[in-house]
Amino acid sequence: MVEVTRPPTKAWATLSPWLPSRGPDADYWWRLTGQHLSNMVEAAGYSTDQQYVALLFHYHWIVPYMGPAPGPDGNLKWKSLLGVEGSPIEYSWKWNTAAGKPDVRYTTEAIGSFTGTLLDPLNQQATLEMLHRIADFVPTVDLTWTNHFFATLYDHDRSKYAKEAAAGAHFTTTVVVAAEWLKNGLNLKTYFVPRRLGQSDGKLPIALWEESLKQLDPNSESRAAMHEFLNNDPEGKLLSPFMLAVDNVVPEKSRLKFYFQSPHTSFASVRQVMTMGGRIPVPESQLQELRSLIAAVTGLDSDFPEDSEVPCISEYNPAAKDNFVEIDLLLSGYLYYFDIAPGATVPDIKFYTPVRRYGPDDGALAKGIADWMTSRGRGEYSQRYLDMLADLTEHRKLEDGKGMQTYVSCLFKKSHLDVTSYIGPEAFDPARFLKHKAHTTRSTRRRSDSH
């Protein structure tokens, strides 16, 4: 059972009593993640109707696929890559512009009865079922490209995957789904982490990615520009692909997002990737804004050398070692995605800094980005963000650790920087179970004292 230490939002308090139990597992996830989501959409200024829609969608379509609740000791059936400790969900808060409001999104890995077994070694059946049920219910959802990548980025002989598992191969997350609650409604995305037979280091050769991509759009000018950068630029050659995302809309409107990891964290390397070696014109003022954002969330001095690597803690969560064994590149360096849009000549590029490893504790990090927003006329929701984070971390104080905030990303727009904070619920953090155990013990003692 999840212990709640703060009053719920009005939307949660109104809806929850009328939603029937779905069993102990789903009830656990609804109480934890449903309240997290309700806090986020309220803090982001969503209308009451929008809050109800987001919560009801989560209850009916996401929570039933979140898998077993953790045991009393925090053990779990399947560890997702979405959280370093195995949480199957990650939230995001896209910061407001000076005249707008934040957007709330979350990404989740569906977990089913056969997850991790010989029947479903890559854990894809629950996601497929969830997506097709949603597509039957939401008319704007189109799974054409999603079905293509399920067919082309994986092998389909389960017996051979079973042999690899018996020989000691480590299988983990291969597909996740994002629900993005924009002011005009729901957007769904599917993210693919390929795992082919014989692939044990988390890296699928770029040629195999391209085999799948060119079947959809053999003459993409934007993708060709990306490959030119990857093949010829010194920084581009260091980028390792690890994930692909698609919008679940009709193919002519869908975009491809190709995710890469770079071992470099110097701002000189960031500049080179974000401009694609000078191919993409980015004003120097925007580059310096990004540099100041990185400094704000990682605790760097404003004059930190542009060609120096950002210092990081050696090991921020021991649980990550075992979970990321085949894709440990995600535990270091910077991340980027290349957005391949229909008809574009060059990709849009988004930058991610993994603040769960770089920078100060969660309290200082949150204050750093809130102050950065305020100093640029975008601070209307800064205090709401800080209060919302405190609501999500009922098991500890923000300043007592790091890892609740996982990434900060930036995408250049014409007039501003699109900035997003990514938040992990720490659903399997030992502190949650210790706190609940103490709470349960106190409650038991009070009951026994009354007899």
Swiss-Prot record:
Transferase among keywords: yes
GO MF entry, a single one: prenyltransferase activity
Lineage: Eukaryota, Fungi, Dikarya, Ascomycota, Pezizomycotina
Chain residues that bind dimethylallyl diphosphate: R105, K189, Y191, K257, Y259, Y422
Catalytic activity, as annotated: (8S)-annullatin E + dimethylallyl diphosphate = (8S)-annullatin J + diphosphate
Pathway(s) where this gene product acts: Secondary metabolite biosynthesis
Phenotypic consequence of gene deletion: Abolishes the production of (2R)-annullatin F, (2S,9S)-annullatin D, (2R)-annullatin G and (2S,9S)-annullatin H, and leads to the accumulation of (8S)-annullatin E.
Keyword tags: Transferase
Gene Ontology biological process: alkaloid metabolic process
Name of the featured protein: Prenyltransferase anuH
Family, per entry: Belongs to the tryptophan dimethylallyltransferase family.
EC id: 2.5.1.-
Pfam families the record matches: Trp_DMAT (PF11991)
Its biological purpose: Cytochrome P450 monooxygenase; part of the gene cluster that mediates the biosynthesis of annullatin D, an alkylated aromatic polyketide with a fused dihydrobenzofuran lactone ring system that exhibits potent agonistic activities toward the cannabinoid receptors. Within the pathway, anuH uses dimethylallyl diphosphate (DMAPP) to prenylate (8S)-annullatin E to produce (8S)-annullatin J. Geranyl and farnesyl diphosphate are not consumed by anuH for prenylation.
